[in-house]
């Protein structure tokens, strides 16, 4: 199965992605991470108004296979979390880049994304091509 990695996103080594629109970063996990985790049964993300710091844990995701930490790709303040995905985590697998986003953050320093991976760089890293 070939997994998708949209070109308009930035990717992290830890498998989170960022869609940047102005100073708002939409954060989720990549199709590779969803595929590796298997059936997702629980997601915990921060509440609106909470601060997150780049590289620090901002939540957890639990599947039938494992529990994984979510790492913040950027620093900022959570302005929205995806309660629909928290309430129905199994839906994440169907659309990780669309309806499956996790949090939206007002970023404090856009330069933090300087070292993020492009779609082709991320694909090469996870697929070894």
UniProtKB/Swiss-Prot annotation:
The coiled-coil regions, if any, are none
UniProt keyword annotation of Zinc-finger present: no
Which cofactors is this protein said to need? (R)-lipoate
Keyword annotations of the record: Lipoyl
Query: Taking every annotated instance into account, which residue ranges of this chain make up the domain Lipoyl-binding?
Result: 24-106
N6-lipoyllysine found at:
65
Q: Quote the function comment for this protein.
A: The glycine cleavage system catalyzes the degradation of glycine. The H protein shuttles the methylamine group of glycine from the P protein to the T protein.
Report the sequence similarity comment from the record. Belongs to the GcvH family.
Subunit (UniProt): The glycine cleavage system is composed of four proteins: P, T, L and H.
User: Which HAMAP family does the record associate with it?
Assistant: GcvH
The protein's name in its UniProt record: Glycine cleavage system H protein
């Amino acid at each position: 199965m070939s997994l998708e990695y949209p070109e308009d996103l930035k990717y992290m080594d830890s498998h989170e992605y960022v869609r940047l629109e102005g100073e708002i970063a939409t954060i989720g996990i990549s199709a590779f991470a969803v595929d590796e985790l298997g059936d997702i049964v629980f997601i915990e993300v921060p509440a609106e108004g909470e601060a997150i710091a780049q590289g620090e844990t901002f939540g957890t995701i639990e599947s039938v296979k494992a529990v994984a930490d979510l790492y913040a790709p950027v620093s900022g303040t959570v302005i929205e979390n995806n309660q629909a995905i928290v309430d129905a985590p199994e839906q994440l697998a169907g659309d990780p880049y669309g309806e499956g986003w996790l949090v939206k953050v007002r970023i404090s320093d856009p330069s933090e994304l300087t070292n993020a991976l492009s779609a082709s760089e991320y694909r090469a890293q996870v697929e070894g091509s």
